[in-house]
Amino acid sequence: MYKRLVQEFFPKLDFENLEKYVNLIEFSNKNFNLTAFSGDILWKEGIFESIFTMNFIVGLVNNKENKKLKILDIGAGSGFPSIPFLITNPEIELTISESMQKRCQFLKDISEKLDLKFNLICKPVQEIDPQKFDIITARAVANLEKLEKITKKIHFPKTLLAFIKGPKVFNEVQNCKNCNYKIIKVNNNINKKIFIAFKQVS
């Protein structure tokens, strides 16, 4: 069902490569425990949600010049949300920070097997050199207070911090003093409450 929904919503994507990516996750999950998603749920909460929410986040960026966007995905694990988005938008400049070595190895494998070009940093985001990213994002990595701390040294003015969250985001905002995140609900077709906590660094 959700595999077909992905095809219907994103007809111009490289569906063959997306299927290969899903198959690699299913195969590698047996040994590496990459994600709890499998089967139709993998297509729903892994693939569709990633592409849909990343499209939404990119829409929050003021990109009148239509420049190549530089995106950092923190703790992508098996590649969510950035890899499905990269497959559908190969023109972006993607960097992934992933500290778990087995997941890093998986990301290296998919880069080679799917011929995907992205920068992979196999260490915690706190240890990477500051770079000018247009967007810094993460999904299911940490609460807003922690995300605020670990990204503090690596963002620049005008960087968009945009984190994919569930309904608990409202409690996280209350606990993150002086963080000043805005919350927006992402209307979607998978009957799931998805929110984006975002702000532009001043």
From Swiss-Prot:
**Top-tier EC class:** transferase
Which GO MF terms does the UniProt record name? rRNA (guanine-N7-)-methyltransferase activity
Record's GO cellular component, any one? cytosol
What's its EC? 2.1.1.-
Q: Where does the chain bind S-adenosyl-L-methionine?
A: G75, F80, V125, Q126, R139
Q: Which UniProt keywords apply?
A: Cytoplasm, Methyltransferase, rRNA processing, S-adenosyl-L-methionine, Transferase
Coiled coil regions in record: none
User: Where does the record say this protein resides?
Assistant: Cytoplasm
InterPro entries registered for this protein in UniProt: rRNA_ssu_MeTfrase_G (IPR003682), SAM-dependent_MTases_sf (IPR029063)
Keyword Cell division found: no
Coarse class of the protein's main subcellular location: cytoplasm
- Paired cysteines (S-S): none
UniProt lists the family membership as follows:
Belongs to the methyltransferase superfamily. RNA methyltransferase RsmG family.
Q: What does this protein do?
A: Specifically methylates the N7 position of a guanine in 16S rRNA.
Q: What is this protein called?
A: Ribosomal RNA small subunit methyltransferase G
Gene name, per UniProt, is rsmG
